């Protein structure tokens, strides 16, 4: 019984530490890179860079959508996208230099402070990002764009 308690306590502490690590990274500072294209407010640039608003929140509300959002940051996007009924050329380079805590932090910044329209936002954890990064390792930018089309119903 004591061993079970210790194992459960260790799991809770590990999950808490990973969540705290993602929250201690400054997602707003990382987002400054994103703002060069998506703008500081996340409104994007018509035809070129999509807004980070309702589409982001809708994706973040679905398990496969959360994987997609991690893949966008870690694998990039290459190909046409339709976001909120408007076409975009769909190119974003992979931000492969970001560790899992940084990816979680920037996604959490967008979901909590920029994309404020749509379903309730649940924070990403470092562990969740690591899981989605691993499951998306074989995707290239074109596959990520197709994943967006599939998840948004534009198949």
Q: Where in this protein do the model-derived segments appear?
A:
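Bacterial N-terminal signal peptides
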Residues: 7-16
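Positively charged n-region of N-terminal signal peptides that target proteins for export
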Residues: 1-4
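Gly/Gly-Pro-rich "capping" loops immediately C-terminal to redox-active cysteine motifs
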Residues: 43-81, 89-99
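The canonical Cys-X-X-Cys-His
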Residues: 27, 31-40, 92, 106-109
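Stable alpha-helical elements in mature extracytoplasmic
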Residues: 23-26, 30, 65, 69, ...
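Electrostatic cytochrome c docking/interface patches
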Residues: 15-31, 57-61
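Flexible coil segments in periplasmic/lumen-exposed cytochrome c-class electron-transfer proteins
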Residues: 83-84, 95-96, 100-155
């Amino acid at each position: 019984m004591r061993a079970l308690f210790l194992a459960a306590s260790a799991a809770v502490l590990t999950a808490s530490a990973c969540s705290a690590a993602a929250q201690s990274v400054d997602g707003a500072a990382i987002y400054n890179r994103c703002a060069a294209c998506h703008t500081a407010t996340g409104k994007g640039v018509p035809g070129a860079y999509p807004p980070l608003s309702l589409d982001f929140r809708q994706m973040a509300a679905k398990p496969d959508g959360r994987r997609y959002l991690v893949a966008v940051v870690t694998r990039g996007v290459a190909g046409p996208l339709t976001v909120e009924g408007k076409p975009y050329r769909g190119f974003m380079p992979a931000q492969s230099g970001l560790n899992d805590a940084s990816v979680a932090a920037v996604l959490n910044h967008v979901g909590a402070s920029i994309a404020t329209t749509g379903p309730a936002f649940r924070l990403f954890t470092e562990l969740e990002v690591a899981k989605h990064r691993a499951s998306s390792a074989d995707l290239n930018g074109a596959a990520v764009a197709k994943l967006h089309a599939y998840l948004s119903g534009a198949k």
